[in-house]
Amino acid sequence: MKLLFAFISCLLIFGSSLWSKAEGAKPNVLFIAIDDLNDWVGFMGGHPQARTPHMDALAKQGRNFLNAHCAVPVCSASRASVMSGVAATTHGSYELGPRYEQLPALNDVPTLQRYFKDHGYTTISGGKMLHHNFNGRLVGDIDRSLGRNRSPRPKGPMSRPANWSGAWDWGAYPKADAEMADIQLAHNAAKTLKENFEKPFFMSVGFFRPHVPLFVPPKWFAKYEADKIALPKNPKNDLDDLPKNFLHINDYAVAPTHAEVVSGGKQRSLTHAYLASVSFVDHCVGIVLDALKSSPHADNTLIVLWSDHGFHLGEKQHWAKRTLWEESTRVPLLIAGPGIRSGQPCKEPASL
C-alpha cells in the first residue's frame, strides 16, 4: 500500500513537469485491478503455459515489480489498504469485512479516488475496486460509474462436487464473451477513453476473473490442451515442518481442501479453468489498453496494473488464498506510461 500511494501522490505533486508536454497539465491515470491473479502471467513466469500477451506487452513498456506483495492475502482487506494507504495492522481488517466506510480507523482517511477528486481529477470507476463498492459516505468519491455487473452462472453445478461451496465451480460457460461482466466493463472503459475531458481523469477498472467461480466462454479453455496442463510441484512432505495447528488453516475457508481436490480428480481441470480465466482477463485488459493507445489521452496517461493478492492451486497442499506463502501474497504490479523507463524489472521487495 505504501508503494502505490506514494507513487500516485508524486503524480499529483510532480506530474506536470514529469509527464506532460502541455504546460500545467496533469497526467491521467488508468488504474486496473485484477481479482485473485497470482504470478501465473507470462512476464512473471509463475506457470510455463500461461498465455497473457497483453499484460506481457505492458510489462515490457514500463516498470515491472517482480517481487511485489499484497498487504493482506484476502480481497476486502487488501483493497482497503491499497485504497487508503493504511496498513491492516492499523485499519484492523483481515477478512472480507467490515466495509471500508465501517472501519473506524479509516473514518478520516480518503480513498485513492477521493484523493484524486480533491486534487482536480474526474474520477471514473467500474467493476470490483473496493470489495463492497463505494457506499455510504464514499458514494461521492466517484463522479462517473462504468457499472458493476455480474456474469451469468449455470442454473446448477457444472463441475463441482455436490458438497462443495457454490463459489467453487468451473467450466466453459457462457457461450459468448459478450455475456461476461468483465468484457462489458472493458468495452465501457474503452468507449469512455475515446471521450475528451475538461479535467484530467483517474479511471479505476476492476476485473473479477480469475476469481471463482471459474466460468469463462469455451474459446478460452480451448487455448490450452486439457490433458497437457502442467500442475504445480507439490512434494508430499512439504508440510512436515509446520506446526500442527497450521495444517488446518484451510478448514475454515470456503475453498476445498487439497485432499478433496485430489481425491475427486479435480486438480487438472481446476488448473485448466484458472489458466483459461487468466487468458480471458488478459484479453479484457487488452481491450482497454488498445482503446487508450488510439485515444486522445495516449501520450498523457499513466497505467497502473495490480492484483489484490495471489492464489494457491495446490501448492503447499492449499487452495485459494489466506496464507503468508508467496503463492498467496505475490502479485503482478506494473506501472507504465510517458516518463516511465521500460525494460527494467524491479526485483526489490515492494508492497501494494
What function would you assign to each model-found segment?
Residues L12-S20:
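C-terminal segment of classical bacterial N-terminal signal peptides
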Residues K2, F7-I8, S20-L352:
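Formylglycine-dependent sulfatase
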